[in-house]
Design a protein with these regions (language model features):
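Carbohydrate-active enzyme catalytic cores, enriched for enzymes
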Residues: 76-220
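Aromatic-lined, polymer-binding surfaces characteristic
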Residues: 1-123, 127-132
């Protein structure tokens, strides 16, 4: 909290560490300084200092409210959106708190990520970005958030998008192969079940020939 970089993706690296520590602590009343589980979770979500901004302040600063685009190059943007999506899952799983409802720009930011794609479905590599394929983890997190909070429209939208970009996801072999093993799995991961009735979307539904993102001063 005392050190770090507050206004870009590094802020989220710090917030993730603080959040993981906070989740394993006892309640505030169990500590002489009053800094327990509630203190650190509240700090991540709502409080800012010179070197560490809250999730809400950072989102207000970095996301374009109209386009959902994060104000860095696609590589860093994907990392930031993925970190926010993982926070969504942590809040759902451990706190029964809908972070997407509290911060609607997150859903828009995830939905906008296909705009980074070239026709070969690799992301454009402007700035400090290496061309590669778009991560689909944040789509999974939006589906899990929708399932946890009864949001069928959101679930159907991101399920169709996920099936469009990753048609192999959903079969048993792929799911077993992609099981993550890390300390975060104690707080986040639950098996993903996709609605088989939702058909894959068409790529044309998620991209446009020209997309203007003024906060990165680029035509994507």
């Amino acid at each position: 909290i005392a050190n770090g970089v507050p206004h870009n993706n590094w802020n989220l690296l710090q917030a993730r560490f603080i959040m993981n520590v906070g989740l394993v602590l006892e309640d505030n009343k169990e500590y002489a300084d009053g800094k327990g589980r509630e203190y650190y979770i509240d700090y991540v979500m709502n409080r800012s200092s010179i070197r560490q901004w809250s999730l809400t302040r950072l989102a207000d600063y970095g996301f374009d409210i109209n386009t959902g685009i994060w104000a860095e190059c696609p590589g860093y943007s994907s990392v930031v959106i993925n970190d926010y999506a993982n926070f969504v899952n942590q809040f759902d799983t451990n706190l029964q708190y809908d972070l997407v409802k509290a911060m609607p720009v997150l859903s828009k930011a995830v939905a906008t990520t296909p705009q980074y794609l070239f026709p070969n479905r690799m992301i454009c590599g402007f700035g400090d970005t290496h061309p590669g394929y778009l991560s689909t983890n944040f789509f999974i997190r939006m589906i899990q958030n929708a399932q946890a909070n009864g949001k069928k429209e959101q679930e159907n939208y991101f399920t169709a998008l996920l099936k469009c970009l990753n048609p192999d996801l959903g079969n048993d072999k792929t799911e077993k192969k992609n099981v993550r093993v890390s300390v975060n799995s104690f707080f986040e991961d639950k098996p993903l079940t996709l609605n088989p009735k939702v058909q894959p979307g068409k790529i044309e539904d998620y991209v446009s020939p020209l997309f203007y993102a003024p906060n990165v001063s680029w035509l994507v």
